[in-house]
């Protein structure tokens, strides 16, 4: 093992004789190693490292403060030992690489304050301020790279899912005059919804699918509705691709999918909430169950049927 820092081991508390107190003098120990037990974590270092800076550790190991030792000679410090190795590195080198996460920096700063290491406290405070000033994205939107990835994302999500598929390369014909604008409006609405419902709904993008512009809505791992925004129309005796922007329909399905935020709500209750009011006529219990299942099936078929039912050319 090279350097002054240490071996780190976690000890289990054991019943034994009470620790005894003793005093250290720099002249008596010099560069000899001392053994430290910091909250159950064991460290080896030298008195020279511990006394380089004017800190509480220097007071402990220069004879100004008494220290506790156990029967095996370990010097006991009643603090968490998680960041003590980092503190030793700072005492030896006057600089360290701070942790990446804010919580760990706060923990390290608390220990530095306890040991009165002002230089390390200043480093931690500056790092926390820098992280505070950094821009953090409001939400992250996955982009699908394969059908398996899409399936895995939807099945594992505890939130409702809204997916927008847009892929201009799927078009075989020319676009109608407003199609480009409508495609852009669909994308802009997706971005607005992802910001508005961030944290409540998982929004994903698909740029490799077989459609040109299509919205899909999922709850509890199941597909609930689909809004396809493209159709083929005839203009001047040739086929063209028409992209629409059914804004109201998209909002409606997005609000419907929010009913699936709580996974423990019974499925029948959710399905009934998104369907039309039930008939007032009296039926047997079996007939009611069959009617509900049939109505749900037809609702899904209706939701999926977003194309114009008229024949092409009419």
Curated annotation (Swiss-Prot):
User: Pathway, according to UniProt?
Assistant: Protein modification; protein ubiquitination
- Subunit description: Component of the BCR(TNFAIP1) E3 ubiquitin ligase complex, at least composed of CUL3, TNFAIP1/BACURD2 and RBX1.
Q: Name one GO cellular component term.
A: endosome
Q: What GO molecular function annotations does the UniProt record carry, in alphabetical order? A: small GTPase binding
The record describes the protein's role as:
Substrate-specific adapter of a BCR (BTB-CUL3-RBX1) E3 ubiquitin-protein ligase complex involved in regulation of cytoskeleton structure. The BCR(TNFAIP1) E3 ubiquitin ligase complex mediates the ubiquitination of target proteins, leading to their degradation by the proteasome.
Cell division in keyword set:
no
One GO BP annotation is: protein ubiquitination
Which residue intervals define the domain BTB in the entry?
32-100
Organism of origin is: Gallus gallus
Q: Where in the cell is it found?
A: Cytoplasm; Nucleus; Endosome
Q: Give the protein name, as stated in the record.
A: BTB/POZ domain-containing adapter for CUL3-mediated RhoA degradation protein 2
**One short Pfam family name for this protein?**
BTB_2
Under the heading InterPro entries, the entry gives: BACURD1-3, BTB/POZ_dom, SKP1/BTB/POZ_sf, T1-type_BTB
Key words of the record: Cytoplasm, Endosome, Nucleus, Ubl conjugation pathway
* Family to which this protein belongs: Belongs to the BACURD family.
């Amino acid at each position: 093992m090279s350097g002054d820092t240490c071996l780190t081991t976690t000890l289990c508390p054991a019943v034994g004789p009470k620790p005894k107190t003793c005093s250290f003098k720099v002249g008596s120990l010099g560069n000899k190693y001392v053994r430290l037990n910091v909250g159950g974590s064991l460290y080896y270092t030298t008195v020279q490292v511990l006394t380089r800076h004017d800190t509480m550790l220097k007071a402990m190991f220069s004879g100004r403060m008494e220290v506790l030792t156990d029967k095996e000679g370990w010097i006991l410090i009643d603090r968490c030992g998680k960041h003590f190795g980092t503190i030793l590195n700072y005492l030896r080198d006057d600089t360290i690489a701070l942790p990446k996460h804010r919580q760990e920096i706060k923990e390290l700063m608390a220990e530095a304050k306890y040991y009165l290491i002002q230089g390390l406290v200043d480093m931690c405070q500056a790092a926390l301020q820098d992280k505070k000033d950094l821009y953090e994205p409001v939400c992250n939107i996955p982009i699908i790279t394969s059908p398996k990835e899409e399936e895995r994302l939807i099945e594992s999500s505890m939130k409702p899912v809204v997916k927008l598929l847009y892929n201009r390369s799927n078009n075989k014909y020319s676009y109608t005059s407003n199609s480009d604008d409508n495609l852009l409006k669909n994308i802009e609405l997706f971005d607005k919804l992802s910001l508005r419902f961030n944290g409540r709904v998982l929004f994903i993008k698909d740029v490799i699918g077989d459609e040109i512009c299509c919205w899909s809505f999922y709850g509890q791992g199941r597909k609930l509705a689909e809004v396809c925004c493209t159709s083929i129309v005839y203009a001047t005796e040739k086929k063209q691709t028409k992209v629409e922007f059914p804004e109201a329909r998209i909002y409606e399905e997005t609000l419907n999918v929010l009913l699936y935020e709580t996974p423990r709500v019974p499925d029948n209750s959710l399905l009934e909430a998104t369907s039309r009011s039930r008939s007032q006529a009296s039926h047997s219990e079996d007939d009611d169950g069959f009617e509900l299942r049939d109505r749900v099936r037809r609702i899904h078929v209706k939701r999926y049927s977003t194309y114009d039912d008229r024949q092409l050319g009419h």
